[in-house]
Amino acid sequence: AFLLENVKNLKSHDKGNTFKVIYNALKNELDYDIHYDVIDAGKVVPQHRERIFIVGFKEDTPDFKFPELVDKRPVLGDVLEDEVDEKYTLKDGTWNALQRHRAKHKAKGNGFGYSKNDKVTSADLKSWTPEQKKRFFADKKGIAKTLSARYYKDGAEILIDQGKKNPRRLTPRECARIMGFPEKFKIPVSDN
């Protein structure tokens, strides 16, 4: 038996041809009974992350079904640390650059993922209502957007509200928690 996992768009890549090649190789050339499904990890961890899972068995398994996932996940606020080093707070230059980038894309009619609001400045944050913050920052009572491999390049995908201070990015431990890693998991690299 085997289990393969990949991005959900594997099914549609190259108009579905990539998936067909993989499926046919596993089914017809290697003689596996194949089952696949797109599953959102957001039902078990506090992160929206849709992935395709492909399982294969050497014997026929007509009754195989992927398990139904029950919404029993923590929310984002459950995995956030109480005390966070200042190095995770966005510097004014980074925060302003993100907003300029967003404004440029908004003017072109493109989306830009870190915000749903118009451009704001650090000074604006001080007067925001809780409702305004809820629309702008990651919802601590919900789940996070998909955490990409390039998160630490700019930290713009998931921003954590810090009241009157600039927002912050997630710590490596918080990222591990979002992906379901246990507390005993050792993070082998620096976060620089």
Identify the role of each PLM range.
Residues A1-F57:
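Conserved Class I SAM-dependent methyltransferase catalytic core
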Residues A25-E29, Y36, E50-N192:
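S-adenosyl-L-methionine-dependent DNA methyltransferase catalytic core
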